[in-house]
Swiss-Prot record:
Species this chain originates from: Frankia casuarinae (strain DSM 45818 / CECT 9043 / HFP020203 / CcI3)
Recorded GO MF terms: structural constituent of ribosome
Xref: Gene3D superfamilies: 3.30.1320.10
Name of the featured protein: Small ribosomal subunit protein bS16
Region of interest: Disordered: 106-148
Top-level taxon of the source organism: Bacteria
Gene it is expressed from: rpsP
Any Gene Ontology CC annotation: small ribosomal subunit
Lineage: Bacteria, Bacillati, Actinomycetota, Actinomycetes, Frankiales
Family as reported in the entry's similarity comment: Belongs to the bacterial ribosomal protein bS16 family.
Composition-biased stretches (Low complexity): 137-148
Entry keywords, A to Z: Ribonucleoprotein, Ribosomal protein
A Pfam family matched in the record: Ribosomal_S16
An annotated GO BP: translation
Keyword Ribosomal protein: yes
Coiled coil: none
Length: 148
């Protein structure tokens, strides 16, 4: 039986996730698999690649052929070079750890507590009640009587 190491597509439209699987060469892309040996998430930055190196080595040693996309993934992880006794690839880009939500909340709470002590940056405008009333009253008293 000819076996291939290929990608099985999962996920939503325009948000693919793949499983790296070993399957018979004649099966469909998402058909029955013999074994799942890894995962690939291309949309995250950097792409997430998880491969069981021991199982990949086993399947390559018994003659399983990787497809072109899987071969590229195995070259990035270094499993292909290990199988072919080639020099190792450069290290992969590692994602930065995400900040803890609790720490973010506490920092925002401390900043808000400090903001309450200060006055507002734009104070309210004072009403000009005296000058507005004088402007309205002046034309009424200065106007001569219409009958004179």
């Amino acid at each position: 039986m000819a076996t291939k190491i290929k990608l099985q597509r999962l996920g939503k439209m325009r948000e693919p996730h793949y499983r790296i699987v070993v399957a018979d060469a004649r099966t469909k892309r998402d058909g029955r698999v013999i074994e799942s040996i890894g995962q690939y998430h291309p949309k995250s930055d950097p792409s997430i690649i998880k491969v069981d190196a021991e199982r990949v080595g086993h399947w390559l040693s018994v003659g399983a052929q990787p497809t072109e996309p899987v071969l590229a993934i195995l070259k990035v992880t270094g499993d292909w070079q290990k199988f072919k006794n080639l020099p190792a690839p450069p290290p992969m880009k590692v994602a930065e750890p995400k900040a803890d939500k609790r720490e973010i909340f506490q920092a925002a709470a401390r900043a808000a507590a400090g903001a309450e002590d200060r006055p507002a940056t734009t104070p309210k405008k004072a009403k000009k009640s005296g000058s507005a009333e004088e402007a309205e009253a002046a034309p009424a008293t200065d106007a001569p009587a219409a009958g004179q």
